[in-house]
């Protein structure tokens, strides 16, 4: 059962990377939600699977399992790979939440650090929005929603772009705030920190990041060909822009620029109805397999716990 849970989890985590060719042809908002659900569900299911794998080993270690044959039979249904792999699963199940917690702490600290420096800048209205302009020579455009919605640009960015391009950049950052992208950007950071050593999962996190940036591009540019070229030109001028602090939205992270420029120049044609439906089949299948496995494991685990008091120690 645990092998099924782990298999379904890894399938979901790798799904955005595996289906990116079709997914990029969807509306960026739909593709971003698809990626986010797959990554969040996969990470949660993986943690549950590791805990399920480790549970028999941990129960034996604390003296709960007995030597009675009935208990042994039940425990054998739960145990996969022996004590060694059980302890490895226990360690992994502990490390992953710790990595996530540390990364989440870094995200909060990064946002608060930037917020503390805002007094150095001046407020200015750009594209109808209040923007903080920091005296930094390097081009910079970021936004974050916590502790309060804020858009920050640098004097270097104002000097590097034409006024209408600056307005496009600000509209892009407004889109991130209005559509609540910060939690999803944090999810990208958490998945990358915890699973970035797995290339397919790292690619899936990158797919979500690109989808969020394209989503904001589409809101900023709309359907007007001229405005789409304005956003594209701003990206072109800032193609080697800074990296934003973790969990914040930057206008032009380098790894997303080329794909975004191509989409702005020539929006991809939507996939056929058949391909659109097929995109959702793997994730649906993984979920339909994982849910019965999780229910079966829970039933077996409850049986073990119920019998623990009657089994000889």
Question: Which residue stretches match the model-derived regions?
Answer:
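Membrane-anchoring/interfacial helices and their immediately flanking loops
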Residues: 1-43
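Cytosolic-facing loops and C-terminal tails of multi-pass membrane proteins
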Residues: 2-17, 82-113, 230, 237-313
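Cytoplasmic membrane-interface segments at the C-terminal ends of transmembrane helices
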Residues: 16-31, 56, 98-125, 224, ...
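Hydrophobic membrane-embedded segments
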Residues: 47-96, 305-312
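Peri-catalytic and regulatory segments of divalent metal-dependent proteins
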Residues: 88-174, 179
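Catalytic Zn2+-binding segment of zinc metalloproteases
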Residues: 174-193
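Acidic/histidine metal-binding catalytic segments
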Residues: 187-188, 226-236
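An active-site-proximal "capping" alpha-helix that borders the catalytic cofactor pocket
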Residues: 210-224
